[in-house]
Amino acid sequence: MAKVRAALDRITDPSVKAVLNEEAYSHIRPVLRESLTNNPYAIAPDAADTLEKYGIATNPFAVKVHSHGAVKSIENTLLERVGFNLPKEPCTFLFLKRSKLRYLRRGPSNNDIFINLAIEPRDLQRYEEDTLVESWTRITTRYAYISDTFHFFTRKMLADLFFHNPALDVLYATLVLPPEALHKHPSIEPDLYTINYNFNGFQYIPGNHGGGSYSHEFKQLEWLKVGHLKSPELCLTFQMIESIGANHLFMITRGIKITPRVRTFTKDSYVLFPQIFHPRNLNPSKPFPKVKAMQLFTYVKSVKNPTERDIYAKIRQLIKTSELSDYHPDEIVHIVNYFVFISKLDSINSYSDILSLPIWSKALLPIKTKITQLWEKLTGARAFNQLLDALQWKTFTYPLEVVDSPQPLQTRDCFIEDERLEIDTLEDEIPPNPNDNTSMSPQSIEEAVKNNPDLPWAPWLLILQAHNADCTEKQYDPENNLILPIQEINTLPKHQHPDIPTDLLTLLTKLHREPTTVSLDNHRARAYGSDVKNLRIGALLKKQSKDWLASFALKTENIEREVLMSVIHGAGGSGKSHAIQTWMRSLNRRDRHVTIILPTTDLRNDWTNKVPNLEQANFKTFEKALCQPCGKIIVFDDYSKLPQGYIEAFLAINQNVILAILTGDSKQSFHHESNEDAYTATLEPSIITYQPFCRYYLNITHRNKPDLANKLGVYSCSSGTTSFTMSSQALKGMPILSPSIMKKTALGEMGQKSMTYAGCQGLTTKAVQILLDTNTPLCSSNVIYTALSRAVDHIHFINTGPNSTDFWEKLDSTPYLKTFLDCVREEKMNEIIAAEEPPTPVQAPTTHFPKVNPTTVIESYVHDLPEKHDREIFSETHGHSNAIQTDNPVVQLFPHQQAKDETLYWATIEARLQCTSSEENLKEFHLKHDIGDILFLNYKQAMNLPQDPIPFNPDLWTLCRQEIENTYLKKSAAALVNAATRQSPDFDSHAIALFLKSQWVKKTEKIGCLKIKAGQTIAAFMQQTVMIYGTMARYMRKFRNQYCPRKIFVNCETTPADFNSFILDEWNFNRTCFSNDFTAFDQSQDGSILQFEVIKAKFHNIPEDVIEGYIQIKTHAKIFLGTLSIMRLSGEGPTFDANTEANIAYTHTKFNIPCDAAQVYAGDDMSIDYVASVKPSFNMIEHLMKLKGKPVFNTQTQGDFAEFCGWTISPKGIIKKPEKMNMSIELQKNINKFHEVKRSYALDHAFAYQLGDELHELYNENEAEHHQLATRSLILAGQATALDILDYGLRDLK
């Protein structure tokens, strides 16, 4: 597999990788779908890993929560195993709910029998009432199954069960008994279940949830050992078929058969230490994990003179915090004493070797050895023999030897001979309603009118009540007109069909929606058929074969057909589909005589969620419904959004349809055909065609509050008020409705949930945002009505244009928007309440890390280092570079790049810089305008910048200029004198003085690198240029800090305490995080990044001459070799800010990043606590950008956390990577500079040091060793006070 993986890693072609990913996904998708059958739960990662060990997959996208979902998935898996073993003939199920049949892969056709005896009170609500019996009844099938109750049986009960049911041959039984309970040990699978021992028994607790626990007696554990059960009349044989954790599946058959002699529940992974102390009770007595025992043994033998405290610290390091409760303090004390003892014993063989002895000594050696052994028996064994005896660990095992019943059992008659359980089949019917009437009687109408004489709709009150609407008060629209809940009444004949289900017909009659006969319009069907045949419309239909298209058009050519229809019109939120969905929820899962046709995938998903009992094949999008068989009853939901002529064409080709139910709203938007050449584009909307066949329009809503609904002319059955707000910016977490598809697409690409005004039909949400722009006046009243009726509680208007009379003219353009004008203006600000002071954090308990041998740690780095010149860069002109210095192996681990190194200087120029011409740079700049625009739109959305350009503030610009000048003047006089040349007005404003940066390379991945790589350049611009564009960067930084979202942290002008506070408050450690490792970040910032910077500067209204000057220096920058290509240079002035903002723009252009994802940025460094998917649009522009990023993923588990700016991001806060810290200290020691940096190192190290015992949850063994060495070095250097004080204020973060 390693060679296959290596071959795949060598593939770099993106198209080939895409094919491989698609192929892999095609295999992954069915596995994930199948896993939801037995394990539909959201499982904790550790429990999911345990389940995977047992072959049970967990869908990482599952969101269903269960208190002990992992154990439930085991139960379901065993049920599936039982179902595979059972024959297709009828079987008897004892103590099993009928709903569990789906896990057994069985259905009603198997005619299975259910017998459930109510033994405890909760059995009455656990099992179906028709399966409960007061006493046992006869089992007449050959196979039976007892579900998770068998452990409560006695042996005699089981013998009686077989004796009195001669037809029963095979009994499958599942029982829940943890084998470790035989030894009173803690759970061997603590991620799945735990065990309490008390009251002379034990409690099995699944998922650590006490509410689902079972109390057991120790005698019940004997079932795990039973091999044969004998009585005078029969003999039963037991065989364990499957064992997963504490759940076991047994097969019990008649007769004496062979069964395995040993039952294995788990592999042997524990050992018992020998009894080396007296008295015996002062020795370790409980099993200890063998892996941890070996780790402790090798530790005490690898460290010189380990102390008792060191061994305690090592044990604490090896045992997870979550596992500490499984150990007793006295047992830990005995284990420590055991290892202290063997640490003092000599492990060097003290006996004579035979290789160095002469021949006569070899002949006498056995005699000498025998005498020595006799002497040691008298005086005591040598230290080496003592060690070997002390290491005779005994393997502890949980497997059991099976036993037979100790004595024959006497059976007794405990079954009823003359009774047999009768299983009644449930009929699909709606429970009777006390107010249910098949029609409105004259008496009921008369009574309603009498009780409500002032209501014009009093005769309709019973029908309104059937829609859960209590319309007994009057409501008025803004013009003070009375709003009628029932409108557009049509008197129509009532027709029936004998095949329509009675309960459905009763429901329609109750709602006064009886079917009526409708003649199909041949012209509409023919127009749709022609458009489909000639590929003018459709997406899926265009992929059908020519024969299918021709056949479809022929079937729609001439139709003369009448169909029963129930047309249901009503306002948004009136519950048009609610009654139909309620009826459908009473149907059998495999019922196929009803098909629901939906205009959109979102609406289809909504129906499948609301009617989960039917298979998804019953719900079809409209195009797929034409290509697949359908039922005899069709529901066209939101049919106004279906293409014109679709309904007629569908009914023309599906002659089996006996009833069509149409639901829609004549006040909302309808389907618009964008292809003007299509015949269907000239047809009138379907809502108009079928409105005459609707008996009445239900003008009520359960969705909108009265203040909103009444303005729309709709009667509200809800209470409360709607909140209206308006601003020029979008709010987070709310869908946006836009008037155009273009805006909707752009917003969607930036991760914002968006829909068009017309496309939001069917949406119901707590709050919605409505985007107002120049396209709003072009929208029809129906479309505006659709958008305004989506929200339940809050509507936020986004005005992207100037806040002037032009904006209010937009509101005047439609009849609805104007009514909300006053509401927006009168909205009051919520009172701001100061937050309470956070409680003082509790200081972590101190800890002690085990002693580590520093020589051993350093040796792992230096033993593979090649000779100096094999690592250096060689140039024929300048010879070898000089980055590897001194003969000290520790110093040689760290390359030292120096400005005077000519070989490295030219190698850096060749690797980092590329020359071209100013004309090519300008061409590159202008060709990348569109990409720069996309980058800025994503940056603007990510950083929450205002919609309108930011007005220029001269005072703020002056302030930023002063800050830049003050910072520059803080340099020493010598530094200012050295830069005198660049301060001269004669210095070319486009010229760059180039230097090699002197530095020690201390990155963790570069420690001990085998080959020296190119360094970094410093580009020295004219000082006036640096000052101007440094001012520009600082000016825009002020606004970036002002608008920066809470979830984004930019590490600029901040302290480690600020960063630490952000991580603790915002970072999510419950998922994999993501970083972007850029390749040649500075060199890759081409014309697209420059365009982004220019657009960003113009948005901040930076003076035009400053922007033009910036373009000049970026496109005309030159060194002694010629003009440089457009790239980022270190001495520009805005380098750090520009890099950071380019990083943000690129990341948000490439990835779909949710608003709740915490993000950190600094230059080319970044990390996000979420694995974001790549936007489809990025694939279209990726090849046009030089900037490339390689994703790096961290699981955020022990030893695998994200790194950012030299800090490790952990659940306890930020900490320095211990490996880098320790190795940096070693370098400073060996170059005699440690005294200069020890305090700053101590202050950084304090973030980890003060976490104390919590570090065991963060560090792996290697990191713990480096942490111990770094801590020891700093304390010996006198920095204990700095480690405790922590000047950054970690203990009092604000």
UniProtKB/Swiss-Prot annotation:
Signal peptide: none annotated. It catalyses: RNA(n) + a ribonucleoside 5'-triphosphate = RNA(n+1) + diphosphate; ATP + H2O = ADP + phosphate + H(+). Residues 1071-1178 form the RdRp catalytic domain. Residues 541-698 form the (+)RNA virus helicase ATP-binding domain. ATP binds at residues 570-577. One of its GO terms (molecular function) is RNA helicase activity. Residues 59-224 form the Alphavirus-like MT domain. This is RNA replication protein. It comes from White clover mosaic virus (strain O). The lineage of its organism: Viruses, Riboviria, Orthornavirae, Kitrinoviricota, Alsuviricetes.
